[in-house]
Amino acid sequence: MSRKSYPNVNAANQYARDVVRGKIVACQFVIQACQRHLDDLMAEKSKSFRYRFDKDLAERVAKFIQLLPHTKGEWAFKRMPITLEPWQLFVICCAFGWVNKGSRLRRFREVYTEIPRKNGKSAISAGVALYCFACDNEFGAEVYSGATTEKQAWEVFRPARLMCKRTPMLTEAFGIEVNASNMNRPEDGARFEPLIGNPGDGSSPHCAVVDEYHEHATDALYTTMLTGMGARRQPLMWAITTAGYNIEGPCYDKRREVIEMLNGSVPNDELFGIIYTVDEGDDWTDPQVLEKANPNIGVSVYREFLLSQQQRAKNNARLANVFKTKHLNIWVSARSAYFNLVSWQSCEDKSLTLEQFEGQPCILAFDLARKLDMNSMARLYTREIDGKTHYYSVAPRFWVPYDTVYSVEKNEDRRTAERFQKWVEMGVLTVTDGAEVDYRYILEEAKAANKISPVSESPIDPFGATGLSHDLADEDLNPVTIVQNFANMSDPMKELEAAIESGRFHHDGNPIMTWCIGNVVGKNMPGNDDLVKPVKEQAENKIDGAVALIMTIGRAMLKEPDDFLSSLDPDDDLLIL
């Protein structure tokens, strides 16, 4: 008996290995997606890991899609079947190959792919939709190609319809009727059709394809499709898009969710995501970055075309943003994060514990925000190594009121609540009773910290801090009220960045602190680019933990020869209680 072969799965896994090893040029998000897959392949050997990679399923889907014909351009004229490139095989095999060990049902309910134009989005989406429509063992499958306009909804449905019309064996084998504006299977009532705008609440999709998600002003279609999948055994939400301009829209929000999943700050075992773009710091005018953002370069998008578009963009500022967005997948209206999250993650040391610093003085800092919101406590230790100051962030604490986590009514707060719920389950976020955070919880944590390590100072955000400040003073925890202005925050913010980049900063990998650090945007003082303070791009992008950490760095710097506050007016900028 001949041994089974898995050429497509093998190519997908080899792609992941080549990306991680640096043999294929890729951005950090692609590297993280590949590393996640490889890590999970190792983890599946453990009984505690809930999922396994089913090579047969993955190979089956990849083979099915490659039986379908091209519907556009030269390859369609030559009647050539689709050939999936290694990156496409990786996405397909991950999306369909990972299953629950017990049920064998699909692991990933949501798949988000962000990729520049002309990289074969519509063809791969049409293939996925047809597979779910005809071959996914779902009785009466409903498959929708959803978009905000009729033209966009047909971008996936039209090639899928043409694939069926040009493949009689497919329609005969699965009993597919191809109509003018929909396809159906009379045998079980399955149907596949385009969907425009808000679909209402009657749909029960098995698969929903959302093409060019960045064009959606609201998440109405996406959410309705997702919530309508409850009656399906293994539904699939397939979103594929280029970058856009609306960072207030649902696509950018989903992008942030994917990034948080990839960097581990908010785990989500049912979400697969991959983002093809350039890295922070890359020069968009450098021809070398084209391959990083465009995995299909030389196949469906030609290098010469991209080089000409790049040159036009360099010569015409009006075209620069279009090129960055559509060909490099850069959200041009999004402000860059201040701290390099890759460097931050390289500073992670999960072996750090409070016991290692027992008896050593520490600085506690508190960012209290609003009582309805997240409140933070950062804990910092310092050590001198080879004449240089090393900083250690260990066991930060975070609190949020119960109602903020579990009694959410407003749609815009839902994503934040889901994020908080994940952290509560992980044991890194403390929920306090009621609608407001009870500061007595925070005081008790500060008192407990002082028993482990003597607290030298407690810098605190002045917003609503009067009561807690007095309580801290009563416990001899030396509260210091810090006004979060340019003068007080600039130098410690720069020192934290320098310490991260030089390896002088160490942290225990707390996911909430990582999330807060990743949300920090630097705002320069008008007329003075040398002064900077931390701000957030959007209200839901909390930076409380990062602000508290920056305050601890500022107080630690006071002990160094260069006193960063020596020139300040203490009455205006620093109030010591």
Swiss-Prot record:
GO terms for molecular function: endonuclease activity. It comes from the Viruses. It holds the Pfam family TerL_nuclease. Transmembrane segments: none annotated. Keywords: Viral genome packaging, Viral release from host cell. The keyword Plastid does not apply. PANTHER family: PROTEIN YMFN (PTHR41287:SF1), PTHR41287. Belongs to the phage terminase family. This is Putative terminase large subunit. It comes from Shigella phage SfV. The gene is 2.
